[in-house]
Design a protein with these regions (language model features):
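Single-pass alpha-helical membrane anchors
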Residues: 1-20
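Auxiliary, metal-adjacent structural segments of Zn-dependent hydrolase domains
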Residues: 26-78
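Soluble non-cytosolic domains of exported or imported proteins
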Residues: 40, 88-89, 93, 201-205
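Non-catalytic terminal regions of proteins
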Residues: 58-60, 103, 108, 233
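Acidic helix-start/capping segments at beta-turn-to-alpha-helix junctions
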Residues: 59-68, 111-127
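Active-site scaffold of zinc-dependent metalloenzymes
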Residues: 62-95, 99, 104
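Catalytic Zn2+-binding segment of zinc metalloproteases
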Residues: 98-116
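Metalloprotease/metallohydrolase-associated module, dominated by Zn2+-dependent proteases
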Residues: 115-241
């Protein structure tokens, strides 16, 4: 009997592993389709030091097709900005991406702020009950990929998904919300979230929300000021010297 149960358990484990692999493979395939024709060749690069925080960083100016023209970070020190990016937007864009560099360098600090200030948690793996249809169509974001799954108040999960299994670009996406308590999937943030955060230009992940608040001055004023206070106190050189 025990031997029989052991065999059944082994089969279940194999089925779960295959299922998990299939989900990730499908998401990988869809993201590859969305990025078809993308080239991220480096055309020019400059290395700088941020006068406010003191961090060293590198800007790589790349092909306009890289991530379909979306600026992004690739590691703790490097941001990629397409050469076609509007020059008048470059200063704010660099500030935005510098926040992502700091998020990569000091993940524990940012996660603590998200939990304390916003009741958010982020994690590397999806929750057990997240629908397969969302996981298979999930859009990968280089700036959030270390821990892409986000939950607000232990219940609501936001995720960027492609609108089809054959997307023409990274722009063919929408933000959907999954309610872990009820299982409902909606295209709008829960009313409680909207009451708390107000209008957010990028609501898929706290990393993007934080970068928008600090660099772009977006979002709820009170929340933005609270975040700016802890951010400046912790990262500004003038407050550390």
């Amino acid at each position: 009997m025990l031997r029989y149960l052991a065999v059944i358990a082994s089969i279940l484990v194999i089925v779960l592993l295959v299922s998990s692999f299939s989900k990730h493979e499908t998401a990988d395939e869809i993201n590859a389709i969305a990025r078809k024709g993308n080239r991220c060749d480096s055309h020019k690069q400059v290395s700088l030091q941020d006068p406010k925080t003191g961090i060293d960083y590198t800007i790589i100016f790349c092909d306009k097709t890289c991530e379909h023209g979306y600026p992004h970070t690739i590691n703790e020190k490097t941001m990629m900005i397409p050469e076609s990016h509007p020059k008048e937007r470059l200063p704010i864009t660099v500030e935005h991406e510098k926040i992502h560099l700091l998020q990569r360098r000091y993940p524990e600090i940012w996660e603590a702020w998200y939990k304390l200030l916003w009741s958010y948690k982020i994690q590397k793996t999806p929750p057990a009950g997240m629908p397969k249809e969302l996981l298979e169509k999930r859009r990968f974001n280089p700036d959030t990929e270390d821990k892409p799954f986000t939950c607000w108040r232990g219940r609501w999960w936001s995720i960027a998904v492609y609108t089809s299994k054959n997307p023409e670009s990274l722009a063919d996406t929408k933000i959907v919300w999954w309610d872990e308590k009820t299982g409902q999937i909606t295209g709008e943030a829960p009313p409680e979230w909207s009451d708390f955060f107000g209008t957010q230009p990028q609501d898929e992940h706290p990393h993007e929300m934080a970068a928008q608040m600090i660099a772009n001055g977006a979002g709820n004023k009170n929340l933005r000021e609270k975040l700016m206070t802890v951010y400046e106190k912790h990262f500004y050189r003038s407050n550390r010297e």
